[in-house]
Amino acid sequence: MYKGKKIYIDAVRREDLPQLMLWRNKPEYRKFFREYRELNIDMQQRWYESKVLNDNTTEMFAIRFNDTDELIGCCGLCYINWIYRNADLSLYIGWNESYIDEEGYAEEGCRLLFNFGFRELG
């Protein structure tokens, strides 16, 4: 877990999947994602099992409020290239219909993700 002033990032949990799927299926969000199709729960489960649990080129995190542990979004490093030491960053805030918010949660999430990447992955 990486903790900031307002939020922290930690492992995506199986029980997070229905909420993440609802946010991901919003058309105004989906247009920005690599996966542009509407997801069903089976697709979301497959993503969790293949990418979150079993892919060494992906590190995904849930974004949660420090004070309530409420899930507010998701972020991760995708397509990690271990040779060239780089990756794509993925992040969205679903809470409060934000996508990328003005309260600074996305910015703080990026900082926490960068800290993870540089400290844990090199």
Q: At which residue positions do the language-model features occur?
A:
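A short, well-structured alpha-helix characteristic of acyl/acetyltransferase catalytic modules
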Residues: 1-46
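Conserved acetyl-CoA-binding loop-helix of GNAT-fold acetyltransferases
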Residues: 101-116
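Residue-level detection of beta-strand scaffold positions
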Residues: 12, 16, 58-60, 71, ...
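Short, polar/flexible loop-turn hinges at active-site or ligand-entry regions and domain interfaces
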Residues: 31-33, 97-100
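Amphipathic alpha-helical recognition patches that constitute DNA-binding helices
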Residues: 19, 88, 108
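Hydrophobic helix-cap positions at the C-terminus of alpha-helices
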Residues: 23, 51-54, 117
